[in-house]
Amino acid sequence: MKISRIAVASLGLFATTAFAQSSVTLYGVADAGIEYLSNVPSASPGGSNQVRMTSGNMSTSRWGLRGVEDLGGGLKAIFELESGISFDTGAQNNSTRLFDRSAFVGLGSKYGQLTLGRQTTPMYDTTLQLDPMGFAPRYSLFKMDDVLAGRADNAIKYRGIFSGLTVTGLYSFSRTGGGEVPGNYKVDRNMGVSLMYETGALAVGAVYDEIQGSTVATADRKDRRALIGASYAFGPAKAFIGYRWYNGNVGALPTNGSNIYWAGLRYGLTPALTLTGA
């Protein structure tokens, strides 16, 4: 059997002898704390209390590399590699992926940014901005949505900013890496699009996300999500409000739809201390 391949596009960064302006940045976030829990399930009636050290409370602990290469004419090549780590143990967050949070390469210009690889979805990007808790790993309401596609493998993503309006679109050939099945392009597919408008203190966003089943048997089934929300900053405070709709049936049995309504407030007591309620 002869297998034919057509390369539609290829993006990459290569070492050259050209004297183009370039940079590579090593960055990271360290988040560790002490947590007290009550009524933890145990052998004791009514549960027990627990004190423990935790990593990734308000933000996932991580490290990464981010690079930019000036190609001239307003065009630049970019890449990002990011890995989650646990500061309480030093272990990787994902034992099978070194760069579990992102691994992409792309091109950018005044018309926007086009990237290929593992990257965040429009649903994640929009929720991160409109969630009062900032998608905090341990405390955000949205962490209860186990199927929310925060990141997608094998993804093409476009992001452009035009006079305060950010437009983002993503298409993943296989969100979890289990798709790309010959003869069935629907398996594990993920699509999403979002609009975010920011002007002064006001931000308004909307996003739609769709996931196909991850097996051939469930490829025609879909998880659908839509979200709309807004935030407004006044003085040291910032208010949030929003709504998320969900309907899905990618599993063996259809699941019930769900709705989430939220409101919240952040208040900066000092430059280093912020109170959040939601």
Map each language-model feature to its residues.
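Detector for outer-membrane/organellar transmembrane beta-barrel domains
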Residues: Y185-A278
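Gram-negative bacterial Sec-dependent N-terminal signal peptides
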Residues: M1-Q21
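Active-site cleft segment of glycoside hydrolase catalytic domains centered on the general acid/base Glu
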Residues: P182
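Gram-negative outer-membrane beta-barrel proteins
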Residues: I34-S42, I85-A91, P122-T126, R175-G179, ...
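Glycine/serine-rich loop-strand microenvironments at binding/catalytic pocket rims
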Residues: A18-S55, S258-W262, P271-A278
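Residues that act as N-cap/strand-start positions at coil-to-secondary-structure junctions
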Residues: P45-G47, F99, A152, R189, ...
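Outer membrane beta-barrel
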Residues: S22-Y36, Q50-S174, V187, M196-G200
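Short alpha-helical scaffold segments that flank and stabilize functional sites
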Residues: G12-L13, S23, D31, D209, ...
